[in-house]
Amino acid sequence: MNKKFYITTLGCPKNTADSMSMHHSLLEEGFTPATFAEESDFHFINTCTFIQSATEETIQTILSAAQVKKQNHQKLVVVGCFAERYPDNISSEIPEVDLFFGTGRYAQAGKILREKFPDLSPPKREFNDSLLERLKLSSEIENYSKPYAYVKVSDGCNRGCSFCIIPSFRGKFRESPVEDILRDVDRAIRAGAKEICLVSQDTVYYGRNSEVLLDMVRKVAEIDSLEVLRLLYLYPDKKTEKLLRLMGETPKIAPYLESPLQHVSSKILKSMNRVGESSTFKDLFALAREVKPGLEIRTSFIIGYPGEEPGDVDQVLRFIEETRPEKVNLFSYSPQEGTKGAELKQTVSEKEKSRRINLIRDVHLAILEEIHESRIGQTYDAIVDSVENDQAVVRRFQDAPEMDEVVYVDDISLIPGMIGKIRIDSFYEYDMNGTWISK
């Protein structure tokens, strides 16, 4: 009895890592991955509810999947953050959902499915515990024809940011043992990954002290078969400074800093229950560029938080103009029930939030155009992500997969996972065109 599953993943790379864990569990229990949702017997939706727009996207995705379910006689399974946060709503308002479970149970997905639907479950996969069989299974599981993979180093968060609902359903910070991280990295590499992205809610919180964090990163970077190591979600504090110095000493670590500041106004940061201020953030960005030549920066800002005034927005604008981060993500603040921020008087209208975001975006786009101009004719280390529509999609080491710029190359002889040099020839608003100059 061949029963197929398909996983739709919403949200951030951390969810992608969780979906890979589900994939592993389902395959181990004898289920088979489907190429398309329509051909699956079980359609999983791994959800996101970080902000209001993410919640709305989740609901729409579930409702759309419910229509597909009716046409294809599937079982619809909703998992992750939305299921953890709104179980009663799913039960009462979306009867099309056959099964739901929250965060922390991804690795048991196969067993959960078998217990819920014993008559629809295939025979459990039989294999011995030899390393060879385990690695063979892992390769089958995690080869998504992508040259990169996400490996979670922890789950949960202890920061207590007043705008963030994640700790309420992800729980307190819990780190993975180094041995488990190394195992997952090795498994992904054996499945074909050339680049490993370490992810978590708060990567720099890992370890009892800075040395534990640095030792974990060193051990991952020392894996001979690893080509590129990328560190994501680096909270802007002192441990990040030490991690940056390690990045400068370690060629395998990508020239990339992702550090979500969320704001630069001291008043707003204090209300958000976050540390740091504009001057320390400037020093952090300057240090990153000093120790890792060619490094590019990705950061994010939440605009329209309660109490934000025009002067606070001006501080964000000045910061962007002075530090010139290559990648800026802007979120419109949406109060999340159960957070401290939701208890504050909402002082900024939705219309004004949009105006402020558009103002900041326009300033950054003007800076980005100048940055693009400086890239013309320059060569960069790069990796081929895919070949589609008679073009290769290539990514510089300065760009993270699935969220940053890509470079389009008119060369279908390139192969996903190939690493070499690319020359930038032209650009769009965000993405670029280029020429592959070494294989």
UniProtKB/Swiss-Prot annotation:
In which organism is this protein found? Leptospira borgpetersenii serovar Hardjo-bovis (strain L550)
Annotated EC: 2.8.4.4
> Entry's InterPro entries?
Elp3/MiaA/NifB-like_rSAM, Methylthiotransferase, Methylthiotransferase_CS, Methylthiotransferase_N, Methylthiotransferase_N_sf, NA-bd_OB-fold, Ribosomal_uS12_MeSTrfase_RimO, rSAM
Binding residues for [4Fe-4S] cluster 2: C157, C161, C164
Give the matching SUPFAM superfamilies: Radical SAM enzymes
Q: Name one GO biological process term.
A: tRNA modification
Q: What is this protein called?
A: Ribosomal protein uS12 methylthiotransferase RimO
GO annotations of cellular component type: cytosol
Residues the record lists as binding [4Fe-4S] cluster 1: C12, C48, C81
Q: Where is the Radical SAM core domain?
A: 143-370
Q: Main location per UniProt?
A: cytoplasm
Provide the TRAM domain boundaries.
373-438
Recorded GO molecular functions are: 4 iron, 4 sulfur cluster binding; aspartic acid methylthiotransferase activity; metal ion binding; protein methylthiotransferase activity
Does the entry feature the keyword Iron-sulfur, yes or no?
yes
Subcellular locations according to the entry: Cytoplasm
Which keywords has UniProt assigned to this entry?
4Fe-4S, Cytoplasm, Iron, Iron-sulfur, Metal-binding, S-adenosyl-L-methionine, Transferase
Q: Name one Pfam family in it.
A: UPF0004
Query: Which family, according to UniProt?
Result: Belongs to the methylthiotransferase family. RimO subfamily.
User: Looking at the record's lineage, which domain of life comes first?
Assistant: Bacteria
Span of domain MTTase N-terminal: 3-118
The cofactor named in the record is: [4Fe-4S] cluster
Q: For this protein, what reaction is catalysed?
A: L-aspartate(89)-[ribosomal protein uS12]-hydrogen + (sulfur carrier)-SH + AH2 + 2 S-adenosyl-L-methionine = 3-methylsulfanyl-L-aspartate(89)-[ribosomal protein uS12]-hydrogen + (sulfur carrier)-H + 5'-deoxyadenosine + L-methionine + A + S-adenosyl-L-homocysteine + 2 H(+)
Function, as annotated: Catalyzes the methylthiolation of an aspartic acid residue of ribosomal protein uS12.
Q: What class of enzyme is it?
A: transferase
